[in-house]
Amino acid sequence: MPPSMIRVLYATDGCAITYSLMLLTGQEPSGAVYVVSYAWDGAGLDEAFSLPGERAEAELLARRPGVTFCLTGHVASVRVRPVFVAAATPAVVRALCRGEPLAARDVLEAMDEAATFALHDGLIAALTMVLEQVRPRTGNAEYAPERPLRSIAVGRRGLTSLFVHHETQTLAAFRRLYGNHNTPFWYVARFGPEEKTLVLATRLHLFHPRPAYDLRALKDLLLTYNPRVDPNPSGLDPAGLLSFAALSRFCCLSGYARGPAAAHAARYVDERVRADRAEMGVLRDYISHDRGSLKLPDREFVTYVYLAHFESFNRARLREHLDAVNVTDPAAPVGRSPLGERAAAAFFRHVRAQLNIRDYVAQNVTPSVARLAPAMGAGYVEDRTYAALAADAPRGLCDAAAGLARRVTAVEERLAPHGWVRAPDEEQQQPGADGAVLRRLLELAAAPGGGRARTALGALLGLPDACPPAPVYRVELAHRRQAFAVLAGDAWGRATARRDAAPEMAAHEPAAQMYVSRHEVFNARLAVTNIVLDVDFRLARPVPAGTLEAAMRGFRRAVLDALALLFPEADGDWAAHPCYVYKSACPPGGALAAAAGSASAASSDDGLEEAPWDDDAALADFGAAPGDEDWADWDAGVPAEVYTCDDDEVGVGIGGAGGDPGASALVRAPVPADERPPCGCRAKMGFRVCTPVPSPYAVAGADTVRGLARVLQQAVLLERDFIEPMGPYLQDFTFVDTGVYAHGRSLRLPFFAKVDGGGCHGRLLPFGDAPPGFDDPRNFHFHARPAHAVTRVLHSLGGEYESFFERKAARNREAFFARRTPLADMLRGLAVDAEDRRALEAFVADVAMAPVLRHLDAHFNGRAHEYAGATAQRVVAKPDWVLFQLCGSARFSCLRARHARSPPARTFVALSVDAHDRLCISLSQQCFATKCGSNATRTIFTAEVGQSCSSAGARCTSSSSG
């Protein structure tokens, strides 16, 4: 076989298999052979096919290469299969270069019989043995089995014999090897519709297959291969190629069939694929690097991955990449694409800033600080921090909500003539209004004295000398009840002395229970002088004691490093700055079980004891929007039976791990090898981390404190001395609850326990060797009066610290996709004022709930009646989303699962505008059962509110029962 070979894809007007068999058996069928496409192997042929017209024909006749005629394969793995081999005769060359039909006589004259039947002899022998049942003899007459095989006729004579005697079976065998369903339209539709892809994609896909990409990808790659070629001299158009004669002439005369455009096409495709993979590799490398170093919550990391791809491969970036790899000179190499570099500059450089706390704060956080004169600062501290916390005996009151409501109402009536604004009567009379007492208590406790002898606080407590402001506490009672307390001072030694008390049953008496379980209520009207972090670690496995101690030292270091950046004018030595760490006591028997290596006790079916309501963290997923700090009336209005601990959900018991969180906090130390067993916390571990705001600063506003907590969590995630020892033990990296920093939310204080059906347990105790002052209430209350003078007030923490990825994604949606109608405008078109709280609540209860009720009736049998007559109370309002809690005459049962003891589920609805610019209402629930995620918010379904806003005009569009 000649070293230079041309492979030809041919077609016939009739059945190509029958036509080919007739040629192979020496017959001369009617009709002609048409060259559809061809490719060559051998460097010498590149020169021949680069010559124009007649010179190319002369060069091919001089070189006399072999020509293999092929048909398409019947299976995808074999795209073309050879049928016969011929010499490059003048007729064959004209068929290649001009697209002229090749007569059967010309094919027979050019056919190389030996080379041709070398392709088919194996098939001919196999067919002969099967069809004529040739078998070697056995037994006494046995002889060499290869002898009858030698006697089988092969070549043209053998094929002719088979074709004559077994025509049907022979045709069937060849049709299993070769495809025979191709028409001119099939080629144009599959490889066209334009000339370049019809010629080049056919050649490259069939003769130069690549397993890495398919035909669609090949055609896309050729879109940027644009060599200059002359117009097709055939004068034909791809849409008019209705016969193989026209198709052959069009393809063989095309400028893409010969010359530099054809010679360099395969090389260009390979280089283009390498260029694309190189740019994709840059993206993969960045993501792989960040996967190990960028500690993000799972949901946020998924957002990051999608966002990285969008930033790298959005329309603008892809257009730049395609312009860079586009070529007009076939011999030119593929250009260098800026895709990876632009992605690094536009996106990943900002991500890298998330990996260094100094860069993170510098690029993403913009603090706003007000400077006060010393006298003004002293007045600010006097009006905005607790006047007193310590006293020889408790000075104040503690009672259930109903009793306090009557007392507050009486006090407001006494103060009304002096300008006090009373709560509206209808607010006090609506269902669940007893909870509004908390908001009213916060107002009375924070009302400044203004130099008057009688104050609102004094009137409330019956203590004329009581100086405001005063702390407000929530007290957990037995059987999921609660009480509230307002104290102008307390004997804190009584509380801290109980640190070693054994677990006990919860009491019903508020005054006694106040020293067992107490939660400080956040008052957004007061200044924050202690940063108190509610830290909950969800564990993949128990943490060894030494590892935990080392990790918490890293935690403290990260917090102080970040605060040093956020408060650059702070006085004092950061290495000596106090940072108090308190840990929730382990479950009873947990430490023994851990030491013995036994598994923790199995939970109940629904986990009601394991996962009680965590009301102070229940809406952490929702956050709080500016201007919505006044929804404490809703928070406290929920019956106390749904209240329990606010922070960690750790379990029951006493005890804690040792450590030294205060020693050498800012000096890196190696993680000590520790053989001590882990503590008894096996699934969750709760901490309270408290550090005073440094002199001369104070912090104002719930949003500011919430922002500080987010920045501090990011700082902890970037601290190697925390993440390296602790990372393998954590299920996720969201452990600082920022939802507690909202007006009316409460957080359990150190030295106090949580309460549920199992009694009082999980007391927050000092972790390790606590620094001096760990038992001083001025060091773990949000609004305690500082010992230093205040001349700087941090009142805003702007920037992108909240969520770099979410904000970036929001900008991309605004830049690349259609803008949605603002929710306020959508509601305004329905004659509803989004700023009018009562009108909005009435709209939800009377109109928007209609599709929700119909969907409940259709898909949740027996549940719709629970929602009949339900009212809606606004919880959170954001520009594009408003959340309401539903309040019904009865409890709402869980819609996600059936529970043995029918636990109540907190139910919400949210108004928003979807991607199709439709007003939608979504129903979601929080169920405290373990199988439902232990208070995790789950959307049950979403329905569209019809534009007519009538109960008949609203229709449900989608649902998911989870």
From Swiss-Prot:
<keyword id="KW-0863">Zinc-finger</keyword>
<dbReference type="GO" id="GO:0003899">
    <property type="term" value="F:DNA-directed RNA polymerase activity"/>
</dbReference>
<dbReference type="InterPro" id="IPR033685">
    <property type="entry name" value="HSV_PRIM"/>
</dbReference>
<keyword id="KW-0862">Zinc</keyword>
<dbReference type="Pfam" id="PF03121">
    <property type="entry name" value="Herpes_UL52"/>
</dbReference>
<dbReference type="GO" id="GO:0006260">
    <property type="term" value="P:DNA replication"/>
</dbReference>
<keyword id="KW-0479">Metal-binding</keyword>
<protein>
    <recommendedName>
        <fullName>DNA primase</fullName>
        <ecNumber>2.7.7.-</ecNumber>
    </recommendedName>
</protein>
<comment type="function">
    <text>Essential component of the helicase/primase complex. Unwinds the DNA at the replication forks and generates single-stranded DNA for both leading and lagging strand synthesis. The primase initiates primer synthesis and thereby produces large amount of short RNA primers on the lagging strand that the polymerase elongates using dNTPs.</text>
</comment>
<dbReference type="GO" id="GO:0042025">
    <property type="term" value="C:host cell nucleus"/>
</dbReference>
<feature type="site" description="Essential for primase activity">
    <location>
        <position position="536"/>
    </location>
</feature>
<keyword id="KW-0808">Transferase</keyword>
<feature type="zinc finger region" description="CHC2-type">
    <location>
        <begin position="894"/>
        <end position="932"/>
    </location>
</feature>
<keyword id="KW-1048">Host nucleus</keyword>
<comment type="similarity">
    <text>Belongs to the herpesviridae DNA primase family.</text>
</comment>
<dbReference type="GO" id="GO:0039686">
    <property type="term" value="P:bidirectional double-stranded viral DNA replication"/>
</dbReference>
<dbReference type="GO" id="GO:0008270">
    <property type="term" value="F:zinc ion binding"/>
</dbReference>
<comment type="subunit">
    <text>Associates with the helicase and the primase-associated factor to form the helicase-primase factor.</text>
</comment>
<keyword id="KW-0235">DNA replication</keyword>
<feature type="site" description="Essential for primase activity">
    <location>
        <position position="534"/>
    </location>
</feature>
